[in-house]
């Protein structure tokens, strides 16, 4: 039997829940689990806000494309699907209502979500992504950031 697929979930994207994004690098505390995907579990306690801000910067700097979006937002889903059609596997950071101050250094205005970081630099929101796609500037930008190889 096939497994049921939850809406807005794809096996080709890595969705990082807002509660546990900061466990990508287990530098602050040793991990008791030997699984390499232990940072995906939502039952992990939140580290302090100082390490939250430092680790959110690491997520942006270590990945070619990062999308910050509200949890369950259709605009974030559109941005993710557009990047997937270009062959890019973006890291999607879903920000919930409980994550009020954890992303202040990355997302300055929560009203303008979703926000994309390409190559460690702020690319803009969905409007900028769509404009670059229509103008033909998106593919060269993704190649320059290392998100596309061909």
Swiss-Prot record:
Keywords: 2Fe-2S, Cytoplasm, Iron, Iron-sulfur, Metal-binding, Nucleus, Redox-active center. GO terms for biological process: defense response to fungus; negative regulation of transcription by RNA polymerase II; response to cytokinin; response to photooxidative stress. One of its GO terms (molecular function) is 2 iron, 2 sulfur cluster binding. It is found in: Cytoplasm; Nucleus. Pfam families: Glutaredoxin (PF00462). [2Fe-2S] cluster binds at residue 73. Its main location: cytoplasm. Residues 30-52 are annotated as: Disordered. A motif (Responsive for interaction with TGA factors) lies at residues 147-150. PROSITE patterns: GLUTAREDOXIN_2. It comes from the Eukaryota. Residues 53-149 form the Glutaredoxin domain. GO terms for cellular component: cytoplasm; nucleus. Transmembrane segments: none annotated. Residues 31-44 have a biased composition (Low complexity). Belongs to the glutaredoxin family. CC-type subfamily. NCBIfam families: GlrX-like_plant. May only reduce GSH-thiol disulfides, but not protein disulfides. This is Monothiol glutaredoxin-S13. It comes from Arabidopsis thaliana. The gene is GRXS13.
């Amino acid at each position: 039997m096939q497994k049921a697929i939850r809406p807005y979930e794809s096996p080709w994207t890595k969705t990082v829940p807002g509660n546990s994004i900061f466990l990508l690098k287990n530098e602050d505390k040793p991990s008791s689990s030997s699984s390499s995907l232990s940072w995906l579990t939502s039952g992990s306690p939140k580290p302090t806000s100082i390490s939250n801000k430092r680790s959110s910067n690491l997520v942006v700097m270590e990945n070619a494309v990062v999308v910050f979006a509200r949890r369950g937002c259709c605009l974030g889903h559109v941005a993710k699907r557009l990047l997937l059609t270009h062959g890019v596997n973006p890291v999607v950071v879903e920000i919930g209502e409980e994550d009020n101050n954890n992303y202040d250094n990355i997302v300055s205005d929560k009203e303008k979500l979703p926000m994309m970081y390409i190559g460690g630099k702020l690319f803009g929101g969905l409007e900028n992504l769509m404009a670059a796609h229509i103008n033909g500037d998106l593919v060269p930008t993704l190649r320059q950031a290392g998100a596309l190889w061909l």
